[in-house]
A protein has these predicted regions:
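Ubiquitin-like/PB1-type beta-grasp interaction modules and other compact soluble beta-rich domains
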Residues: 2-98
Length: 99
């Protein structure tokens, strides 16, 4: 069985872009059966502060961070275990509160 590989696009919000080399988009190599968690692990390996801003100490998404896979909130899918395929788009949204 041949493994399918390709790229997933990770869209980074403006507030987090300085943590990933000021990039609005990252192209991530994805293997067959990759999960959202594995992709976030790969980004965090290169950009550790980004990883800490998006996930807490237990590895779960922080409350104020949402990740969408092709427009669907991953929390409504299979959370961080949601499978990601080549050609899909992950978008990170960070809530901003102020007053």
């Amino acid at each position: 069985v041949a493994l399918m590989t390709g790229e997933v696009t990770l869209l980074v919000p403006r507030l987090l872009q300085p943590l990933v080399g000021n990039s609005a988009e990252l192209a991530l190599d994805v293997g067959d059966g990759a999960t959202v968690a594995q992709l976030l692990d790969a980004v965090a390996a290169e950009f550790p502060v980004f990883g800490r801003r998006v996930r807490d100490e237990t590895g779960e998404l922080r409350r104020f961070v949402n990740i969408y896979l092709d427009g669907e909130d991953v929390r409504r899918l299979d959370g961080l275990k949601t499978r990601v395929a080549a050609g899909q788009e992950l978008m990170v949204i960070q809530s901003v509160a102020g007053g």
